[in-house]
UniProtKB/Swiss-Prot annotation:
Role played: Promotes the efflux of actinorhodin.
Gene: actII-2
Keywords annotated in UniProt: Antibiotic resistance, Cell membrane, Membrane, Transmembrane, Transmembrane helix, Transport
UniProt cross-references to Pfam families, sorted A to Z: MFS_1
Region ranges (Disordered): 1-33
Protein's name according to its UniProt entry: Probable actinorhodin transporter
UniProt-annotated location(s): Cell membrane
Keyword S-adenosyl-L-methionine belongs to the record: no
Principal subcellular localization: membrane
Native species: Streptomyces coelicolor (strain ATCC BAA-471 / A3(2) / M145)
SUPFAM superfamilies: MFS general substrate transporter
GO CC terms in record: membrane; plasma membrane
Membrane-crossing segments per the record: 78-98, 109-129, 135-155, 170-190, 202-222, 232-252, 259-279, 306-326, 341-361, 369-389, 444-464, 546-566
Length: 578
């Protein structure tokens, strides 16, 4: 379909207003603007399909990550990289993606992004090792950042002001449905192991959706680009990408390498490069050149506070979501499906919280409702950590549901208001750019959260392993003695158990069994069974303790977010039809 055909109203289905001549008079006799795009609602379905693909790609990985590592091998940092790879590329390239759409055409960039994203999903599904999967995830994130920003511009282009709110309102149910069903479908696919695909089928979900989105985009989306061709800040792009990479890489890899000097050198270098990025942007602004970020926005203290709240808040909640999924599967031994169903109340009540905010809380209470959402979320996290700490190995899904549900409700209230309040002091003509930067910071928070909280959690697993064995040593000795083990044999087995648990938590190859663990398997059958029970108890205790301590850090980050939120505007932006 040509651009001319795409822009011509379909007279059989178009509303009367769409059939008026472009330059003809309106109902009041004044000149009417161009008619709205006739296929706009069908085109909106294409844009929603792309959003769902992006959402699924994030939610399914939390469920599939343990199975990926078990199959491909590698250290625990593999789990971090297959998540960080996507979010880091998405965060860095998100603003650039919008600029490319303005320059080369939104439809063209949407189609290129959708084709590339779908192809990258297939690459993920056939990855032969963790390195290939991580590279494919980086590619996915970059192409997602090219595809997703075009939707905002296309919606503004296709819909008249009176329909814009309804168009954006369609995102809520679509995203809510994807958030609820995504993990459940992923858990089922991993457990079902259809045709021997296992976790690989999780990435193949995007194939039929991607094909439908691509075909729909070609047939339904209108052409369009910015009236004025924007400039592109290549140097700024290179600086921010290299700076963030230099910071994130040692955060993820430093722990398993024993925090060598090069890790700290790289982090210092990354910080220096980011300072250089700010200096470059200031210089470009003085010269009237292209900038990656509108620095005038950062001078608005309340908007800058919104960026700070988003960074700290999403650092806490994104890392928590991944680690909870790992704790359920690796720590407690839940199947992927059971883990996904256990976490479903999070998504369900998140949607409920967002609906409540949009219907009542946001307009009536403003920033107070946002603060309330943070308190409810922190309460849910507190309930979770107390439940995990008290129950340890005997934990059931139903015991976790109250904390997860309360946390999800608070999360929904918070994110339902954050963007509207953070953008309240931004001028109308700057809203698109400001929203793009805020979304990029949100994705950066996802990246930092997985890197920092993941490193903390995995570090705790190694450092407290010995204490976890010692906590259950008395019971283990009783069971070993009943199995016929002598005192000397008990001492040796417990010593090997301490080393085994520590090495299992910090080993760089999941396919290799540490020597200390093999020693445990060489005992007599009755003794080996008692030792295995002791290992499972210590293993679960180790994960539970690490999870509890990490959740305290999450609560601390929520407290920081609560304090920073006092700098936000008291009320959200009033809808003005843009």
């Amino acid at each position: 379909m040509s651009s001319v055909e795409a822009d011509e109203p379909d007279r059989a289905t178009a509303p009367p207003s769409a059939l008026l001549p472009e330059d003809g008079p309106g109902p009041d006799g004044t000149a009417a603007g161009p008619p709205p795009y006739a296929r706009r609602w069908a085109a909106l379905g294409v844009i929603l399909g792309a959003e769902i693909m992006d959402l699924l790609d994030g939610t399914v990985m939390n469920v599939a990550a343990p199975a990926v590592r078990a199959d491909l091998g590698g250290s625990l940092s593999v789990i971090q990289w297959i998540t960080v790879g996507y979010t880091l590329a998405f965060a860095v390239l998100l603003v650039v993606g919008g600029r490319l759409g303005d320059i080369y055409g939104r439809k063209r960039m949407f189609v290129v992004g959708a084709v590339g994203f779908t192809a990258a999903s297939v690459l993920c599904s056939v990855a032969a090792g963790p390195e290939m999967l991580t590279a494919a995830r980086f590619l996915q994130g970059g192409l997602g950042a090219l595809m997703i920003p075009q939707g905002l511009g296309l919606i503004k282009q296709m819909f008249p002001p009176k329909e814009t709110a309804a168009a954006f309102g369609a995102f809520g149910p679509a995203i809510g449905l994807g958030a609820v069903l995504g993990p459940i479908v992923a858990g089922f696919l991993v457990d079902a192991d259809l045709f021997g695909t296992g976790w690989r089928s999780v990435f193949l979900i995007n194939l039929p959706i991607g094909v439908a989105v691509i075909v729909g985009a070609v047939l339904l989306l209108p052409e369009g680009k910015a009236p004025v061709r924007p400039k592109f800040d290549v140097v700024g792009m290179a600086l921010v990408t290299s700076g963030l990479t230099l910071l994130i890489f040692p955060l993820v890899q430093g722990r398993e390498r024993g925090w060598p000097a090069w890790a700290f050198v790289l982090m210092l270098a990354g910080a220096a490069v980011l300072v250089g990025f700010v200096a470059h942007e200031l210089r470009q602004e003085r010269r009237g050149g292209a900038t990656l970020i509108e620095l005038s926005l950062l001078r608005r203290s309340r908007y800058a506070a919104g960026l700070a709240v988003a960074l700290v808040f999403f650092t806490g909640v994104s890392g928590m979501s991944l680690l909870l999924a790992l704790h359920l599967q690796i720590g407690l031994g839940f199947s992927p499906t059971r883990a996904a169903l256990t976490m479903t109340p999070w998504s369900v009540f998140l949607v409920v919280g967002a609906i409540l905010t949009g219907a009542v809380l946001g307009s009536k209470f403003g920033r107070k409702a946002l603060h309330g959402g943070l308190v409810v979320l922190a309460l849910g996290v507190l309930i979770m950590l107390l439940t995990i700490g008290d129950q340890a190995g005997g934990l059931t899904s139903w015991e976790l549901v109250p904390g997860i549900a309360v946390a999800g409700l608070g999360m929904g209230i918070m994110i339902g208001l954050l963007f509207d309040i953070a953008l309240a002091d931004v001028d109308k003509q700057e809203a698109g750019t400001a929203s793009g930067v805020l979304t990029a910071v949100q994705q950066l928070g996802f990246t930092v959260g997985v890197a920092v909280l993941g490193t903390l959690f995995f570090g705790l697993l190694g450092s407290q392993a010995t204490a976890s064995v010692d906590d259950g040593a008395s019971r283990a000795r009783t069971e070993l003695a009943a199995a016929g083990a002598s005192t000397t044999e008990q001492d040796r087995l417990l010593a090997d158990l301490r080393v085994c648990l520590r090495e299992s938590a910090s080993q760089q190859d999941s396919e290799r069994t540490p020597d200390s663990c093999r020693n445990l398997q060489q005992a007599r059958p009755a003794v080996a069974e008692a030792t295995a029970r002791a290992w499972r108890t210590a293993h679960t205790e180790n994960f539970s303790t690490a999870m509890v301590r990490t959740l305290w850090v999450v609560i601390a980050l929520l407290a920081v977010s609560f304090a920073l939120a006092f700098r936000l505007p008291p009320k959200p932006r009033e809808e003005e039809g843009f």
